[in-house]
Every structure is written in structure tokens, then in C-alpha cells.
A protein has these predicted regions:
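Bacterial Sec-dependent N-terminal signal peptides
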Residues: 1-27
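Serine/threonine-rich low-complexity intrinsically disordered regions
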Residues: 2-4, 37, 46-49, 92, ...
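Extracytoplasmic electrostatic interaction patches
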Residues: 104, 108-176
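LRR N-terminal entry segment and analogous cap-like coil->beta motifs
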Residues: 78-122
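Sec-dependent signal peptide cleavage junction
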Residues: 18-86, 174-176
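Short, charged/polar "capping" segments at the starts of alpha-helices
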Residues: 24-34, 98-100, 120-124, 147-152
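Recurring C-terminal helix/loop segment of individual leucine-rich repeat
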Residues: 50-53, 101-104, 129
Length: 176
């Protein structure tokens, strides 16, 4: 009787241990990203309740998106740099896997702007770990040329990296 009880307890302990290890592995391999529409981020409902840091971040994002900045463009394997110490990197989904080896001036990039060109690309992934060599990167901004939702963009985001804010915008028409 004692042997059976011991075996049952041992089996229960083993099962719980394996389950908890799998749960930990799953939670660290992918993270749920909070993707927000850029217009919602840039126009907070009540700026009086925003911290000074949050307001500075909003101003920084506005400046990066709307003001002329030194920029790198990387499309179809071709890197073009305009200005010294680029802060913006413009690219498309098809070019992401080559960014680490192709981009020469990474140290000052604060925002990567990724263009989605068709709805089939929503089935692809954006692995945030691809951006780990961009030391000053803070923002990922996804511009979609077709209707999409924050949830659809969230489903594309994989990889563990909590330091980036991820935004999106639907912008039909030519953005280049």
C-alpha cells in the first residue's frame, strides 16, 4: 500500500514538474505584444493624467514619424542612407531577415517602419529578436496598405523583447 501511494505521489510530482516547465517555456518563447494604432498613441484621451516620460515619448514618436530625419531605406536588398546617423529605418516585411547583416549604421536607429503590402503578409511573423543589434531602437511602426486590425498585427509579432513599442496604421495609397 505504501509503495502504491509513493508511486502515485511520485507520478503526480513528475507530471506537475513537466507541466510547469512547459508553461514557462511557452510563456518565454512568445510574448503578447500590445499593438496600438498610431493615432490612438499620439492623441491620448487625457494628457493631464500622462506622466512626463509618456508625453516625451509621444513627442519623440511624432518627431520621428512626421519631421524630416536622417534615414535608412532598405528594400529588395538595397540600402540607401540619407543624412548622418540615421534615426529611421524604412523597410518591408520581405527584407526583415536580412536587416542585421545589411544595415551598416544601426547605432542611432530609434524606429523601424515596416510596410505591409498585401493581406497575405498577415500570415507571416515579425520576430522582435531580429532587431536586437539595433541598440537605440524603441519603436516598431507597421504601415499597412490594406485594412487590418491591431489584433491581426499582434498575431504577427513573436519573440521576447519588451523594450519596443509597436504601432500600426492603415495607409492606403503610395507611402514612399
Amino acid at each position: 500500500m505504501k509503495t502504491n501511494t509513493f508511486i502515485i505521489l511520485l507520478f503526480t510530482f513528475y507530471t506537475v514538474t513537466i507541466f510547469s516547465q512547459n508553461s514557462t517555456r511557452i510563456s518565454t518563447s512568445t510574448t503578447s505584444r500590445n499593438v496600438i494604432a498610431i493615432d490612438d498613441y499620439l492623441t491620448p484621451l487625457n494628457s493631464a493624467n500622462q506622466s512626463a516620460v509618456a508625453l516625451l515619448n509621444i513627442q519623440n514618436v511624432k518627431s520621428l514619424i512626421y519631421d524630416a530625419q536622417p534615414s535608412t531605406y532598405y528594400f529588395s536588398g538595397v540600402e540607401k542612407i540619407y543624412g548622418e546617423k540615421p534615426k529611421n529605418l524604412f523597410t518591408d516585411l520581405n527584407s526583415l531577415n536580412n536587416l542585421n547583416s545589411a544595415i551598416t549604421l544601426k547605432n542611432n536607429i530609434e524606429i523601424i517602419i515596416i510596410k505591409l503590402e498585401n493581406a497575405n503578409q498577415l500570415n507571416s511573423t515579425i520576430n522582435l529578436e531580429l532587431f536586437s543589434s539595433f541598440k537605440n531602437l524603441k519603436y516598431i511602426y507597421i504601415i499597412s496598405s490594406f485594412d487590418t486590425t491591431a489584433q491581426a498585427i499582434t498575431n504577427m509579432i513573436v519573440g521576447k523583447n519588451e523594450i519596443y513599442s509597436v504601432f500600426y496604421k492603415v495607409e492606403k495609397g503610395d507611402t514612399n
